[in-house]
């Protein structure tokens, strides 16, 4: 007579083999998900590289920041146009070039796209505040952010910004980086680039900007929308005087 199968009792527990099988399944799923994430990340980096390489000979039509601002304005303030016109580097006043360097990144011509001391100071300030309030950005870092990234402040986005900064410094010379920056940076509500700023504020081409006009425009860069609405701000005039005095020492990037 055959023995009847014995049913698991109330204290029955799955075998070690079954537990190992489940763990292997979870590990495979995690490996797959990690591979998909890594592949997507790599594809994104290759896209950035391809775009930047193309911009060594082709002028960018717009930036991610500009497109986001255009969308926002079209919904919130549809009467406000986007003003932007690309002009060659030699059609931008040397006064504006010197003023922007004096105001935003005094060592731009010689640094590698990063200022380690500024990054460390920003890190300490952010740590003290418990959130990101400062980025310690050079001109190249600002360009990386404006060309590709959102306005969100996070350490992940900051890391991506540093990677794109390295790409820009590797694939483009300093003069080209500065040319793209001057043609894409925000100078006011819907105002992008040196030519649009010169026409909007002074009704002249960017090539004719004076030292004082250039200093005022450069001072607006950290908060352009605010200063667009507060052009008579005492701070704007005071800070412009400081920048005007520093412009003579500002070193422009060498032509390649």
Curated annotation (Swiss-Prot):
As recorded in UniProt, its EC number(s) are: 2.4.99.28
UniProt keywords (A-Z) are: Cell inner membrane, Cell membrane, Cell shape, Cell wall biogenesis/degradation, Glycosyltransferase, Membrane, Peptidoglycan synthesis, Transferase, Transmembrane, Transmembrane helix
Superkingdom classification of source:
Bacteria
From the UniProt record, which GO molecular function terms apply?
pentosyltransferase activity; peptidoglycan glycosyltransferase activity
Q: What GO biological process, any one, is recorded here?
A: peptidoglycan biosynthetic process
Pfam families recorded for this chain?
Transgly
Task: Using the UniProt record, name the top-level EC class of this enzyme in a single word.
Answer: transferase
Record's keyword annotation contains Cell membrane: yes
Kindly state which reaction or reactions the protein catalyses: [GlcNAc-(1->4)-Mur2Ac(oyl-L-Ala-gamma-D-Glu-L-Lys-D-Ala-D-Ala)](n)-di-trans,octa-cis-undecaprenyl diphosphate + beta-D-GlcNAc-(1->4)-Mur2Ac(oyl-L-Ala-gamma-D-Glu-L-Lys-D-Ala-D-Ala)-di-trans,octa-cis-undecaprenyl diphosphate = [GlcNAc-(1->4)-Mur2Ac(oyl-L-Ala-gamma-D-Glu-L-Lys-D-Ala-D-Ala)](n+1)-di-trans,octa-cis-undecaprenyl diphosphate + di-trans,octa-cis-undecaprenyl diphosphate + H(+)
Fetch the InterPro entries from UniProt.
Answer: Glyco_trans_51, Lysozyme-like_dom_sf, PBP_transglycosylase, Pep_trsgly
Instruction: Provide the topology term for how it sits in the membrane.
Output: Single-pass membrane protein
Q: Where are the transmembrane segments?
A: 26-48
Where does this polypeptide localize? Cell inner membrane
What pathway is it annotated to?
A: Cell wall biogenesis; peptidoglycan biosynthesis
**Chief location of this protein?**
membrane
For this record, an example GO cellular component is:
peptidoglycan-based cell wall
Q: Which family does it belong to?
A: Belongs to the glycosyltransferase 51 family.
Job of this protein: Peptidoglycan polymerase that catalyzes glycan chain elongation from lipid-linked precursors.
Q: What is this protein called?
A: Biosynthetic peptidoglycan transglycosylase
